[in-house]
């Protein structure tokens, strides 16, 4: 027993040393580097207050205009889903398009228990499967936690599109490369908000540095009961939801 205790003490002493941490990072580079970045610098996250979303689709319009996303409704970097839960337990989900009626559902329909909107986008995972499957390194994670795509090196193999559990990627019909939400990286690098956050009339969308205690994101996380999508997949998403129903996946 004493020998076992001595071994464990020695094991944990080595584990806590810098050399052991470096070894772990070599074995699990994407996850370890994400954790390291989260501790040392800016680490961007996104919040959605579901009860505030009115389904106006201004966010979708702003995103398309800002990022040259094709106008066709099936090409999106961010989208909004309408959820209708009926009293019999049935849940109906439909993605809305710009110009759709914003009212979740007629109040006169007595079969409806609840109707609401859920904005969705790339979850900017701390442990992103899309980065891990890219055979040429075109999909990568920045030091501040944003997953981007290098159009110059992307070969359009679609592996990342298939690997994304959130359905947040598509193949751009003109560039033939993978495309997705980037948190409007060109804007946030200059201290601006993502276009979708800036135009939201109800402040249902929130953005900020998770490591800054006074940032809108940090306040959002402190003041709400928070959920993430598909938490069991160990992707460590950085899109956080308040007032999210269990039906949402």
Question: What does each model-found stretch correspond to?
Answer:
Residues 1-15:
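N-terminal secretory signal peptides and thylakoid transit peptides that target proteins
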Residues 16-20:
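Intrinsically disordered, low-complexity regulatory domains of metazoan transcription factors
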Residues 22-62, 232-234, 240-241, 246-249:
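C-terminal segment of N-terminal export signals and the immediately downstream linker at the start
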Residues 27, 32-36, 58-80, 127-153, ...:
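Iron-sulfur cluster-binding cysteine motifs and their immediate structural context
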Residues 28-50, 64-124, 136-143, 147-151, ...:
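Sequence context of c-type cytochrome heme-c attachment sites
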Residues 106-107, 113-131, 238-249:
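Short flanking/linker segments adjacent to small metal-binding domains or redox-active Cys/His motifs
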Residues 176, 180-183:
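Catalytic cores of enzyme domains
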Residues 195-249:
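Long, compositionally biased charged/polar accessory segments in the mid-to-C-terminal portions
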């Amino acid at each position: 027993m004493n020998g076992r205790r001595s071994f464990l003490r020695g094991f944990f002493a080595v584990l806590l040393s810098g050399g052991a941490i470096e070894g772990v990072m070599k074995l699990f580079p994407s996850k370890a580097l994400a954790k390291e970045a989260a501790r040392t610098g800016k680490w961007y996250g996104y919040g959605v207050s579901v009860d505030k979303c009115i389904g106006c689709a201004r966010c979708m319009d702003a995103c398309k205009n800002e990022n040259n996303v094709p106008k066709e409704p099936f090409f999106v970097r961010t989208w909004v889903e309408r959820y209708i839960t009926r009293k019999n337990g049935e849940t109906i989900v439909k993605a809305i398009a710009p110009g759709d009626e914003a009212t979740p559902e007629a109040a006169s329909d007595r079969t409806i228990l609840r109707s609401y909107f859920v904005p969705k986008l790339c979850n900017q995972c701390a442990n992103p499967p899309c980065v891990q499957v890219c055979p040429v390194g075109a999909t990568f994670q920045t030091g501040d936690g944003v997953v981007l795509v290098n159009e110059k090196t992307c070969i359009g193999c679609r592996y990342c599109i298939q690997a994304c559990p959130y359905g947040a990627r598509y193949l751009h019909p003109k560039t033939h490369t993978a495309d997705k939400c980037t948190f409007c990286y060109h804007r946030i690098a200059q201290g601006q908000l993502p276009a979708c956050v800036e135009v939201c009339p109800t402040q249902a969308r929130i953005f900020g540095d998770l490591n800054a205690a006074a940032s809108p994101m940090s306040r959002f996380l402190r003041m709400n009961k928070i959920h993430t999508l598909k938490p069991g997949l160990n992707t460590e998403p950085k899109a956080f939801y308040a007032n999210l129903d269990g039906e949402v996946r």
